[in-house]
Every structure is written in C-alpha cells, then in structure tokens.
A protein has these predicted regions:
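Sec-dependent signal peptide recognition
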Residues: 2-7
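N-terminal module-boundary/linker segments of secreted carbohydrate-active enzymes
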Residues: 20-57
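Thiolate-centered catalytic microenvironments shared by cysteine-dependent enzyme domains
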Residues: 24, 86-186, 271-293
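Active-site neighborhoods of enzymes that stabilize oxyanions during catalysis
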Residues: 32-35, 77, 143-226
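Helix-loop module immediately N-terminal to the HCX5R catalytic loop
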Residues: 76-107, 231-262
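C-terminal soluble interaction/assembly domains
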Residues: 242, 247-250, 259-287, 291-299
Length: 299
C-alpha cells in the first residue's frame, strides 16, 4: 500500500507572550498563514470562532468569545445512524442562530488537530451543509497566543432565525452509496436520480489496519467492494490541520478530477467530513462525505 507523507511542520511565528490566562483582544485583525494551498486563517472583530472540542477542553483553554459546538448534538438518534446529520435541519439552524451563527457569518472552527478525530472539520462540514458559506477550520494550537481559561462573560449575541439552504452535494446518503456500488459506478459513469452521468471514486480514510480488516468494523463485518483507495485522514493535513498540498496534488496525478463524484468514507462520518472539506478547498467540488459511515452502510 502506498503511503502519502504528512506535510512538513510549518512553524507559526506570532508576537505576544503566552500565559495561563491570556486576555488577548479580538479588536484587531490577525492573519495566520497555516500552509500553502489554503487561504490564511483571518481572525477579525467580525469572526466567530467555533470550538469543536469537548466541554472539558474548552473550559481549560479557549479563544475568547468562542462558541462551543459538539458535532454529536446534531445527528440522528439511532445508534446505527450516529454519524448521519439530523434530518430536522430547521431545528439545527435555530440552535445555530441562538449561538450567534448566521449564514453570513465568517466562521473559523478550531479543534484538537491531529490529536483528535477531525471534529473541527466535521463541524465546518455541517455548517457548510446548512448553508454557511464562509467557514474554515484549523487546530486550536495554531491560535495558542489567543487562548484563555476565563469563563465567557459576554457570549455572542443571538442571530436572527434563518432558513437553512441545504448543500445536498456535500452529503452522500446510504442510498447513493449502495447505488454506486451496485451499478459499479467506479468502473463506468452512471446517473444517480436523473442527475449528470458521473464516475464515482471512493476514498477510505480509516487507518491502514482498519482498512485491511485487522481492527474496527471491518474486522467483524464484510465491507462491500467499492474499489476504494486508502489514505488515512491525517495525511490530508499539515500540523495545523490545514490541507496538505502533497496529498491533494497526488490525487490529481492518480486521475482524480473535479468532474468525478468523490465519496469519502470512514466508520462514523467525522474525519471523512474533514477530508471532504479539504478536497473542496482544492477544487474537487463534487466531493461528498458519507456522514453515516460504515456503521450506517453495514449496521
């Protein structure tokens, strides 16, 4: 199996000293260049920082005025559908509005980076799916000079209630995945539900051991053949959890194109969501996350 190396660590030089409880103001605009191939992260007075980590990690250190959001609070209730984004998208949008998020918000989602499971990418994907256009994500370590452990005294004001404009192309359903498998759509292009005829490509972003059936769901259940290539999700990112140029350029060299329907898959639709957003950032505009993951495909 081919292994695609991780990007070289990119050092981020920032001014200011770090203390246990830094009170850095958001009154100034600050750009964080976190790697080639991705737009710099910009923190300005209008930026909303969303924190995708656990409540404990948030209480320990967070960006001032950031909004904690757990991706698992926005999924279907059935255990086998744990990764599927909730069907009641209006309810999800109302909760976002109460947290201060609107479709026009400039969002930066932060999380545990390569030490986590791509939760910041999953939250960013969810926001984009609901119609929030300007959303990026990175590791919170990239913003360390801004962190504080003080409780929030002035949380963001609620936004007006808004209607979600669903970007359905970001999400692959069980029905679409099974259709592609049954029609051998990874060999010959097909039309799904009357849409344009497209060739399907599957990228499995689980670990190599999980992909080979030595651990995880594939160790106890049969995974149907979808001619998926295996690239563990962390190889799509650099140390700041920004898209890794080398991996994404190699996909193009392997014949992956923006015209193809690329479906990213793992067990639960979390790290696969992060990879989907990285693919979109590099012009693979029909890339989709199978949010249900293998636990939905083979319950």
């Amino acid at each position: 199996m081919k292994t695609i190396g991780l990007a070289i660590l990119i050092l981020i030089a920032m001014s200011g000293c770090q203390t246990k409880s830094t009170k850095t103001s958001l009154s100034e605009q600050r750009a964080f260049d976190l790697g080639n191939g991705a737009q710099p992260i910009v923190i300005s007075p209008s930026t909303l920082v969303v924190d995708a980590r656990s409540a404990f990690d948030y209480s320990t250190a967070h960006v001032p005025r950031s909004i904690p959001i757990n991706w698992a609070d926005y999924v279907e209730a059935e255990p086998a559908q744990h990764g599927i984004i909730q069907n009641d998208t209006y309810s999800a949008a109302r909760r976002m509005a109460r947290a201060g998020i609107s479709p026009d918000s400039q969002i930066v989602v932060v999380g545990s980076g390569l030490q986590g499971n791509g939760e910041e990418g999953r939250v960013a994907w969810m926001l984009a799916y609901l119609g929030v256009a300007n959303v990026q994500f990175s590791s919170i370590d990239a913003l360390k000079p801004r962190l504080t452990n003080e409780p929030e005294s002035q949380p963001p004001k609620s936004a007006d209630i808004w209607k979600p404009v669903i970007n359905e192309s970001l999400n692959a359903t069980r029905d679409e995945v099974l259709f592609a498998i049954n029609k051998n759509a990874f060999i010959s292009p097909v039309s799904y539900k009357g849409g344009p005829t497209r060739l399907y490509k599957f990228i499995d972003v689980r670990s190599e051991r999980a992909y080979l059936g030595k651990e995880g769901i594939a160790a106890i259940k049969h995974v149907p053949n979808m001619e998926a290539i295996n690239i563990p999700w962390k190889q799509f990112f650099n140390s700041a959890l920004r898209p890794n140029d080398a991996t994404l350029k190699q996909l193009r060299a392997m014949g992956y194109t923006p015209e193809q329907r690329i479906i990213v898959i793992n067990d639960d639709g979390v790290s696969s969501a992060a990879v989907t957003m990285a693919l979109r950032a590099y012009g693979f505009n029909r890339a989709a996350n199978y949010s249900g993951g293998l636990q939905d495909l083979i319950p």
